[in-house]
Amino acid sequence: MAKIITENFKVETTNELFNSFVNTNATVGSNFATSLATYNTTSSLSLSSAQQTVIKGFVDTQLASLKPESDYYIMGSSIDKANNISNTQHEKRDFQRRVIFGNKITDDDVRYMFKSTTWTSGTIYDDFDDTQDVSLLNMFVTITNSEGNHYIFKCLENNNGGPSTVAPSINVGVAGSVDPNTYESVSSSDSYVWKYMFSVTNSDAQIYSTSDSLPLPYPAYGDSLVKSAAKESISQVLITNTPNSLFSKCVFGPGTVTSSDPTGTLTSSTVTLEAVTGDSPTDPIAKNIRIKISPKPGAFLDTASNAYTNLYLWRNDGEVYDIITSTVSSATGDLIDVTIDTTHTKASFTNGARTYMLVPKIEVSRSVSTGNPCIAYGVIDRFGTLVKVSFIDKGSKYKYATAELKLPPGVSAASGFASLTPTALRAVVSPTGGHGSNPVNEMSMSRLAVITNFSGEDLLIPDSNFYTKVALLKNPIFVDGTKPTQFDNRAVITVAGDKTSLAIVGHYVTQEVSLSGGNGTESETVVSRIHSAVYDGSSNTKIYLVDVSGNFQNIYQTGNIFVRANPNSVTASSPISINNASNDVVYGNYSPYTGEILHFVDFDPIQRQQDRKEKIKFIFDF
């Protein structure tokens, strides 16, 4: 019994984490308030502003209860470290106790990441196949231009497993490049078919890229034009079996597949139209067509009635016409009279720029009646062997399909046909939504990058001393109830005079304090470490502290404090006076030990400087 965890499960897990960074309740509440105010006016409800506020409050309460939002922060901690961190409760709490500063993270700081593979000539790339585990296929490539922008392509056809020798073109709408209707790029040299997916700007890549991955564009999550044009179509039709030279009676002229023909269709320049008529001399619609051919040397035409039905008359402007009847009408066997089913005018067939071929008809079933049908035709080589299936229209709204080669009576009546193994075709259906509609699912993106910057130019990020750890925390609590976009968590003691000579960075500030409780008066030592000390040049010194700790309340009181080289040192500085602890001591806003640490890392001490910026990047790979 097989048990398989699909790539969808991994992607869904990634989606859930990504979506948890997206907070929309405030927008929903605001939109509701706007709609309520409009309805109040148009329906003459006479609700006061206060009543509308109360009603909106009900909605906000329900949103908070039924759709709780998460807040994420990347925080820096610990000016030094005694050991490498480990995944233990002690280490996580030690990080939370020693938080120094942090930034709030939103969905703008998060990117889906995908594996980037640079296109390399001579590589055999996998083409999309709905019977294969697509997460294991090497079918996505990256092309990088001179500006450093990255263009992502998906292989739809690989020329029956041939090597790719021509890079997909990044130009949209240019002849031989990306078709602006389908966003497919067809290589005329190696017969590869590529689907343009999206591009990644150089600036985005510089911020989020890793050694082997690039970020999905935000907020479009792909290319909006490609996504809107995507259809649930036939991706390709594979030939799983076909007899050699099956269509030898249908090879006219040179009978070769030219490398300069981007459609990969049979070149047969000697097929021309001798005459085009309607049902009557005055009928403008084409009906009866006389085709002049040059038979391949040594070959012959089948003179039987309707021998060339079940073929298409192909026209180089992307049209095919079903041949209803056929008759070989000349003694030399170079003329075929056919009737076709079309609403096109006779004039459209006499355009001098038109070229024509007779090609095998491929019939593809439909999943639903409302979708556009797939119109496909066969490509034969100079021997008349079916080698490829090409398309006029790949159709839409396909979930499942079968494909069948329609045989002209002249082919099926040939000697020895009954002993041949029948041609077998397999229709490959595009993913749900169509190629390019959902890059996250199509590329099995189960990796997220979370980015923030700590800059010395930011007002709330310290521009001195060190930090040795960073972590991503979910739902930390702040003392004042806010959710700041950035915070400095250092405690600050303001004292009179210039005390910078006493407040030595790295030393400890201690104070013995008395506490009254149910067991009488108890004492504790409040200890913190000096992060920096700044004299304002006139009256006061601000002493910035980290690692504030004590047995009970962890707060300084009005009175003297002392600076020591270590907390237990007998030797202390001259006393420094806190005149009014209520006003002169300010503690960090982050409530210690709150928030769930999802990821944390330690490193050698990083020095904070005013002209320095550190980029912090977490990669989550599911």
Regions found by a protein language model. Give the residues of each.
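Sec-dependent, cleavable N-terminal signal peptides
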Residues: 1-2, 622
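Conserved, function-critical positions that sit in or immediately flank catalytic
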Residues: 190-622
